[in-house]
Amino acid sequence: MSDTFVPLSRREFGLSLGGCLLGSRLFGADSSLPWMGPATVKKVFLAVPQPTWPRPDLDVAREKAELEVTLSELERKHAGSVVLTGGDLVHTPEQAEAFAKSIGDADGLLIIDLTSGTGPLLRPFRDLATPTLLFARPYSGWSYVDVTTWAQNGKKADLVSTSEAGDLDPYMRIFRTIHHLRRCKVLVINSGTGPNRTAEAFTRQFGTAFGFPGYQDLKAVYESMDAGQARTAAGEFARGALKVVEPSMDDITASLRLYQSTLGPTD
């Protein structure tokens, strides 16, 4: 069967997009779709066994405990966007190597240096593909030199040197975006030409999955969706409005049914 393109008006296109947004709520997708969940970020603290800087009598355990409180507050502030896991205190390159191997499929890595001399502890993290953020308080050490070099050499890494926890807020949103891009799936409706170099480059950079169904493929899936379920969802949507001026109930139902259909072809 040859693909047939059916043109949409600007209003029809907008309604279709609106149906997708509404569908994520009306069909309970917020909690079930992998791209809608929070980012998982593993945190690790670095400190040499015998500190000399920022001072030789530094209580490393106390410093870590205070920062754990700060990071817990940060996580609560961004509940639903980021989950901070891990929290190991690494003293040796061997411990750092073991922690690096435990990162697995985490969306990001948060490194906190507590002392100077942590260069050897950083090396196991240098070649990881996991996006990395260094949280370095002023004068805590010189890890920022290593991480800056990583970024200059193309690693997905950044650093923030600050004593203000609020300066980490933008990075929590970035981690959430990284998670979303890694887990989401994009449908490009075309004439069956398949992947292109732009999509392949985007996948390499962000991990996003692309599907390239033809119009007839999408139409077939659309028609297989439960029209009654879409009609029920449309009624729920309409009841939540003060007044539905436009679109018609048929249009709302069709938009929500289209949303349902987009969940199938990329699985």
Locations of regions flagged by a protein language model:
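N-terminal export signals
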Residues: 2-30
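Fold-independent oxyanion-binding glycine-rich loops
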Residues: 17, 113, 138, 189-191
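Metallocofactor- and cofactor-centric catalytic cores in central/energy metabolism, strongly enriched
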Residues: 31-119, 123-144, 175, 204, ...
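Flexible, glycine/proline-enriched loop segments at strand-loop-helix junctions
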Residues: 56-57, 157-162, 184-193, 245-250
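Short, glycine-/small-residue-rich phosphate/pyrophosphate-handling segment
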Residues: 139-178, 182
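Short acidic/polar capping segments at secondary-structure boundaries
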Residues: 139-140, 163-167, 191-195, 215-219
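Short, aromatic/basic amphipathic alpha-helical patches
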Residues: 144-152, 197-206
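Conserved anion/nucleotide-ligand pocket segment
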Residues: 176-205
